[in-house]
Amino acid sequence: MGPKLLESRLCLLLLLGLVLMLASCLGQTPSQWFAIQHINNNANLQCNVEMQRINRFRRTCKGLNTFLHTSFANAVGVCGNPSGLCSDNISRNCHNSSSRVRITVCNITSRRRTPYTQCRYQPRRSLEYYTVACNPRTPQDSPMYPVVPVHLDGTF
């Protein structure tokens, strides 16, 4: 049992490393990619328009995406809240917001195989708390923030 758990943790860490490396290959730091995917102060955003930007980077239709209607600085502030276990049940760098924010969840309505330039989405808007995973900033990030959000772990 012990070796299997260790192997699965190593695989998860390798997968996380690959995701972070992919974000870097796209010319973005993990925190910059987090901001592109999840931070948008326009509470009336149009999912079809905003998701085009994300899908252009990915070159595929993303099935679901959550936008937080808050500032990046406010999301960074959440990194100062007590840390806890992330949804992967392994990482312990997740932090819950202390107040609810407006969110928009964009859910794909077109087929996933649709060309990424033609994806269509349905919005769902609500007011929720959120959880972010935070890491020390990279050298390419602003020195203003020593710790930055790199992953939206969920909303509640």
UniProtKB/Swiss-Prot annotation:
GO MF terms, alphabetically ordered: endonuclease activity; nucleic acid binding
CDD domains: RNase_A_canonical
Domain of life according to the entry: Eukaryota
Binding site residues for substrate: 62-66
Subcellular location field: Cytoplasmic granule
EC number: 3.1.27.-
Stored SMART domains: RNAse_Pc (SM00092)
Alphabetical list of PROSITE patterns matching this protein: RNASE_PANCREATIC
Keyword entries, A-Z: Chemotaxis, Disulfide bond, Endonuclease, Glycoprotein, Hydrolase, Nuclease, Signal
General function of this protein: Cytotoxin and helminthotoxin with ribonuclease activity. Selectively chemotactic for dendritic cells. Possesses a wide variety of biological activities.
Entry text on domains: The N-terminal region is necessary for mediating chemotactic activity.
Family statement: Belongs to the pancreatic ribonuclease family.
The protein's name: Eosinophil cationic protein 2
Organism: Mus musculus (Mouse)
